[in-house]
């Protein structure tokens, strides 16, 4: 069964000989399972796990959202960079940025419920509004203000949901290959058009209709690499055993994959509801500095479908296209994105 599940995703990837490398590397990782520490309760990764020093940040936790939510809190200052990951990643996606960005602001990087070092409670639902509620609880418990939202993938709808509820706490917006739904009338139309062009969303819809979605995503421990490749990154040289371990670690069993399953399933069955801002909140957010960064080779969230959403809310916002980056542009072009955000922050201080 595991082999079949893996082949399903590999065939969708259509990446030729690279599939053989995926099979080899993931088989090797599976063979190492006996060496992994036993997980306990509903958190898959030990608080002290650094993944061979690539994640050196102190683990912090809050129970404010009603479950044990992990976040890192680095640097100091009145301004806060709030880093929001997407599917099926965690704060590790920002590991190469945190060290640099914390020199300019306080950096808070939470893991959504069911991802990373956060808990995966079995009694909760994992729809968009749940993730917005959880993020809101974290922000209020830490009393974060002057927030620059840095959002990737579904971190965008979550972050924009926070912005709709608390526009006064938001200083600026950075969307990295991330939708920015904020009451635009054509959101549904653009989502539908994107599905027609996206192998990942086509797979989600088909997998749900054929009843295999939960089975496949429940085994991300085995097929994490092929799933990431289907969503899209360009630089295969980033792949090594530590990298694979970090991204597969949150999902040791199907019980720990509820977050990844929930995000995909919620899209397929229409459970994700975007936060709709009030007129006052929309007017306030539209005045904020904003920047969109997009890896052009993103075949999951296409720039031509989603950049117009950003430009509708932020007509004066900066837009940067990275030609040699895919959906996981933070992996493909980490230095370029790091520097773009630093310049963006400097620009706000000088204005």
Regions found by a protein language model. Name each.
Residues 1-5:
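Positively charged n-region of N-terminal signal peptides that target proteins for export
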Residues 7-14:
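Bacterial N-terminal signal peptides
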Residues 17-19:
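Boundary at the C-terminal end of the N-terminal hydrophobic targeting segment
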Residues 21-59, 67-74, 80, 108, ...:
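Flexible "cap/lid" subdomain of the alpha/beta-hydrolase fold that forms the substrate-access gate
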Residues 73-117:
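Conserved HGGG/HGGXW glycine-rich cap/lid loop of the alpha/beta-hydrolase fold
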Residues 95, 160-164, 338:
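Short, hydrophobic alpha-helix immediately C-terminal to the catalytic nucleophile
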Residues 325-334, 338:
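Catalytic histidine-centered segment of alpha/beta-hydrolase-like enzymes
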Residues 340-348:
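C-terminal alpha-helix
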